[in-house]
UniProtKB/Swiss-Prot annotation:
GO terms for cellular component: tRNA methyltransferase complex. Keywords: Methyltransferase, S-adenosyl-L-methionine, Transferase, tRNA processing. The keyword Ion transport does not apply. S-adenosyl-L-methionine binds at residues 44, 69, 96, 118. It comes from Exiguobacterium sp. (strain ATCC BAA-1283 / AT1b). Its EC number is 2.1.1.33. The keyword Metal-binding does not apply. This is tRNA (guanine-N(7)-)-methyltransferase. Pfam families: Methyltransf_4 (PF02390). It comes from the Bacteria. The active site is at residue 118.
Amino acid sequence: MRLRHKPWAKEYMEAQEHVFIQHPEQLKGNWSTEFGNDHPLFIEVGSGKGQFILGMAKQHPDVNFIAIELFESVAVSIVQKLVETPMPNVRVLTVDAKRLVDYFEAGEVDRVYLNFSDPWPKTRHAKRRLTYKTFLATYEAILPKAGEIHFKTDNRGLFEYSLQSMSQYGMFFTEISLDLHVNEPEDNIRTEYEERFSALGQPIYRMEAVFRPKN
């Protein structure tokens, strides 16, 4: 997907201090202060334009959500939506997922969502996949013991790779679906990509994976 450059995005987001966090490293260990409560904290890595995370935040007002989207030209769409329809339990970051440990203390995040991540199909790019072992170690470092990853994709290759990567890492699966929309849960929040690929008849793959507590 080719990203459309939006030169105004950075300045616009920085003006929305109640939504966009410019220096998340300053909040490491203190996100409950930012939200003004100690509700569970869920993050989505690769939030796109925010349809999923905003839907989740509306559905679960007693949970705090952080949308993480590397590209400002994409993340600005989330910020705009939050300006139009304020949601006090959502914040937005434009940071690299490799550095999550710089922004969250161990156990500070209660759940990680990975939705329709870039599959990076070439073998030489495997390390860039968000379910590669180094990324799994990063998520494990900020989640509590037995922390969860919820994952959705339309790409069977990435799904099979992720099952293998997580299994080899020592994780176990509490749910696996090879066609989510056959018996779609009532509370499922669809992403933009999910709606698009489902309309084309493409099955949606989903799993919930849990880290095994280490002694």
